[in-house]
Amino acid sequence: MPYYMNIAIGASCFNNGQEDATAASAAVATNPRPYRRDIHTAILPTSPTATSSRAELNALVLALETALERKAGLQFRPRFHLFVKSCSSYVVGIMTEWKAKWQMNGWKDAKGNVIANKDLIERAVQLEEAVTRGGGGFVAYQLVPRKWNGYVNWVARKALQWETKGQ
């Protein structure tokens, strides 16, 4: 019997791409039986410059780390099926379409430039491979409307507000 895990990811960024930008990521894992909601947040470092794209990718890394922890804690090692929901077409596109091409091209785009956010993308790919290692499992990515991702984006925004008020 497979183990199913659902994680919604989201992010918030103030002053996106500016020198003084701050960003936060969130991953909210839910399981129906027993009902459980695990909330994970992270504030992005200021270097490299925080952007909404980096925050969304960092949310994916949080989600995959959460899944890996959960998988390691399972008693019988069932097939592990992870469903990641995101309102970021950038993140979903990377993990479903572009990563294979970029890997073959040495993490370069069609023009020969090193892809943006390579560090986070490589980390996400490594974590995805770790989650599916052992056979029988998979990670699926679903692009959802922003309004469906309201809670997780709110969590990221609140984490960022909390962080910026504390400084």
What role is predicted for each listed range?
Residues 1-55, 66-72, 159-166:
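RNase H-like nuclease fold core
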Residues 16, 60, 64-160:
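RNase H catalytic domain
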